[in-house]
A protein has these predicted regions:
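Hydrophobic residues within well-ordered alpha-helices
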Residues: 1, 23-24, 72, 110-111, ...
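Flexible hinge/capping segments at coil-to-helix
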Residues: 60-77
Length: 186
């Protein structure tokens, strides 16, 4: 998108839960790290048009009795801090939510039997399950979501430029190639 806009991109690696504060403080112009649109985030940042579909899924061990989201009440659930999985997990009745800085840390806790399930974005979940033979993703998604780029609230100039770039990339087919390569790659 930055290339399409004719701008230089500087990537800053930071914890997921610090992305919105970084945008608000001006430390970052935008966040495009698997950020999904939800009501809480819309209070603090503006979002571009959607560039890909997403979902929060549930990872369990292959021998787990958990078969659907309905089985999560009362369980120990691992989430990555600041993600929508983190936000939604708080709504699960009597669940003990354990927060981790990285999704891989939650998966490690699941493998060690410290938690019963992990709620995380579908695409990283596929990678974690592929790399951890004893795990599986439940067929039923926990939530369906949309990926978009977050920008500072009220920065309509940047938002409009990004939306125009996303539109051009969609129309040319280039956006789908990027999504296939970086987001939905198996």
């Amino acid at each position: 998108v930055a290339e399409q806009m004719g701008m230089e991109l500087e990537i800053q690696d930071m914890a997921f839960d610090s992305l919105i504060p970084a945008i608000q403080s001006g430390k970052a112009d935008f966040a495009a790290a698997g950020m999904t649109v939800n009501e809480d985030r819309l209070k603090n940042v503006d979002f571009t048009d959607t560039y890909a579909q997403a979902a929060q899924v549930i990872i369990v061990t292959k021998d787990s009795p958990i078969a659907s989201p309905d089985d999560l009440p009362g369980k120990k659930i691992g989430v990555q801090t600041g993600t929508t999985g983190d936000i939604y997990a708080d709504d699960i009745e009597n669940a003990e939510v354990q927060r981790f800085n990285k999704g891989m840390e939650a998966v490690m806790a699941l493998n060690q039997g410290k938690i019963d399930a992990v709620i995380i974005d579908r695409e990283p979940a596929k990678v974690f399950v592929k790399e951890n033979e004893g795990l599986k993703i439940l067929d039923e998604a926990f939530t369906e979501e949309e990926y978009a780029i977050a920008v500072k609230k009220g920065n309509t100039e940047l938002l409009d430029k990004m939306n125009a770039a996303i539109k051009e990339l969609k129309e040319s087919g280039e956006l789908q190639k990027i999504v296939d390569k970086y987001i939905t790659a198996e």
